[in-house]
A protein has these predicted regions:
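Conserved RecA-like P-loop NTPase helicase motor core
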Residues: 51-219
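Conserved helicase/translocase motor-coupling segment
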Residues: 1-45, 110-142, 148
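Soluble C-terminal extramembrane regulatory/interaction domains of multi-pass membrane proteins
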Residues: 41, 46-50, 61
Length: 219
């Protein structure tokens, strides 16, 4: 499930940072490959221009809680004698629960879970990719992100830790070839991106490139 993938990604973030630092200190250029950016797990909680006091992984569990109120129903369109059926996603409103429960028991249970999630501290980042990038940048390295993410979480102070205060910021559209050139010619020290990021470009060490440091792939 998306939440399990998010958890595994968040757990591995610190390990990936240390692995990248080791390669950089050895004189290599790390290329970090990821399966997904997990952007949707936080864009449902925060929009560009907003601040998040605590970028805690546990907050993505709020998405799971909200998903419990979603269900699929059959709808139909009729054209002449032909009837076409299709699925539509609908959402229960909290008020709808009163149709099934005679008291506020369900509402109290929901509020309890929300409070529990908001107070949970796992010390894991809500956006592992942002924690990785900004942790390395804080060490003085230049990192390029080759993904299609539109919103990033900018840490107010990365030194505070993985779950510090962040601000949601719109990300500029990247020029894939330009970023590859910057990596190959020494402007960037590290690349992180989806597994298909290198399609159509060369990230290998070559005499044609200024930066001759050995490339190391970390997955």
């Amino acid at each position: 499930t998306p939440t399990i993938r998010q958890l595994l990604f968040s757990i591995k973030a610190e390990e990936a940072i240390q692995a990248a630092l080791e390669q950089l200190k050895a004189g290599h250029k790390p290329i970090i490959q990821i399966n997904r950016t997990m952007e949707s797990n936080y864009t449902s909680l925060i929009q560009p221009g907003m601040a998040m006091p605590k970028a805690e992984f546990a907050l993505c569990l709020l998405n799971c809680l909200k998903d419990m109120f979603k269900y699929k129903a059959l709808a139909a369109t009729k054209k002449g004698k032909a009837v076409k059926y299709y699925e539509v996603e609908q959402t229960f409103d909290m008020k709808d629960l009163k149709k099934f429960f005679n008291n506020d028991e369900a509402k109290k249970a929901y509020d309890f879970l929300v409070k529990k999630i908001n107070s949970t501290d796992t010390s894991l980042p809500l956006s592992p990719i942002d924690y990785f990038v900004q942790s390395l940048e804080n060490k003085g390295y230049k990192v390029g992100e080759m993904t299609q993410r539109k919103t990033i979480l900018k840490y107010e102070n990365i030194k505070v830790g993985a779950t510090g205060k962040t601000h949601a910021v719109m990300r500029k559209k990247i020029d894939k070839k330009r970023m590859a050139s910057d990596f190959n010619n020494g402007v960037l020290d590290v690349l992180i991106g989806n597994r298909v990021m290198s399609s159509g470009i060369s990230l290998h060490c070559s005499d044609a490139f200024t930066d001759q440091r050995k490339r190391t792939v970390i997955t």
